[in-house]
Amino acid sequence: MKASTLVVIFIVIFITISSFSIHDVQASGVEKREQKDCLKKLKLCKENKDCCSKSCKRRGTNIEKRCR
């Protein structure tokens, strides 16, 4: 009985660690997307610090704002 409990604990720990590593990979993908989107003419507009020029307007149906 003790051996099966240890195996179950090991499996739960393994699944937890693997889910954290998958989450980190997805987060790095989001960071890469943000870097790609921040091109010279299509920089994302920040509310506090506008990375664009003063003409920051909505583009498309997305909530995020981009420069023209």
From Swiss-Prot:
Lineage of origin: Eukaryota, Metazoa, Ecdysozoa, Arthropoda, Chelicerata
Protein name (database record): Urocalcin
Residues of the site described as Essential for stimulation of [3H]ryanodine binding to RYR1: 66, 68
Highest taxon above the source species: Eukaryota
Region (Essential for stimulation of [3H]ryanodine binding to RYR1) residue spans: 57-59
Annotated compartments: Secreted
Sorted UniProt keywords: Calcium channel impairing toxin, Disulfide bond, Ion channel impairing toxin, Knottin, Neurotoxin, Ryanodine-sensitive calcium-release channel impairing toxin, Secreted, Signal, Toxin
Domain characteristics, as noted in the entry: The presence of a 'disulfide through disulfide knot' structurally defines this protein as a knottin.
PROSITE patterns: SCORPION_CALCINE
Coiled-coil regions listed in the entry: none
Organism in which the protein naturally occurs: Urodacus yaschenkoi
Family: Belongs to the scorpion calcin family.
